[in-house]
Amino acid sequence: MTLKTLAGAALAAGSGAVLYLKLLRQPILTWGATVEEAEARLPGDELLEDADGVATRAITIDAPAAAVWPWVAQMGPYPRGGAYTYDWIENLLGLNMHSADIVLPEYQQPQVGEGFGYGANKMSFKIVEPKHVLATQSANGNWVWSFILDEQDGTTRLISRNRFRLPRLRDRIGMIPMEPGSLLMERKMLYGIKQRAGKLASQRETARA
């Protein structure tokens, strides 16, 4: 490969990075969220004040929070309920995810301090407010993942916020190409919760009829 070719490749890569950072990154990190949601201080933010990266994604679910919460509460690797996304991708990464289509009664009462493995990370519940907030944090403190359920008129706004501390420059650079992949997985997860919550709400309505 000639010096000219290398220079051209470097220029193309640099131009692509600039394009991504200026035009694509923010929509990827805030998919589904309103400007207000993306900029708001949310429960769980206080667990990691000096985050180097934040992703806020959201979806509206046509079901009350009581039908959404069970799916959030039981999330996690087997024997918990999985993450409702592409299990085969997560399992290639060694996460042992098996997305449940039923409510698992034994995982409906997460407790503050309770932990579970998540690949190389050990996560623990830091904030548990049933039908409203569930926040977890990694053992090293560098990752906080919070779910906020905001019910209005029988529908629920489900907000997922990830906050990261990336101590090393290589970590910060390495995170950039991972961001589109995280959107792919999280979008599937949010739709997975929406589908399950809607079905559960319908089942409960039928049972009451």
Q: Would you name each region that the model predicts?
A:
Residues 62-66, 127-131, 148-157, 197-202:
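A short, structured loop/turn motif at beta-sheet edges
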Residues 2, 13, 168-171:
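Amphipathic, low-complexity, repeat-rich surface-exposed segments
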Residues 54-56, 120-121, 142-146:
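Short, surface-exposed coil-to-beta transition loops
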Residues 1-7:
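N-terminal alpha-helical membrane-insertion module
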Residues 109-113, 128-136:
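Short, hydrophobic/aromatic-rich segments at coil-to-beta transitions
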Residues 7, 11-14, 19-112, 203-209:
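Hydrophobic ligand-binding cavity/cleft-lining segments
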Residues 100, 117-119:
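Flexible, solvent-exposed loop/hinge segments and secondary-structure transition points
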Residues 31, 37-38, 137-195:
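Beta-strand/loop substructures that line and gate deep hydrophobic ligand-binding cavities in soluble
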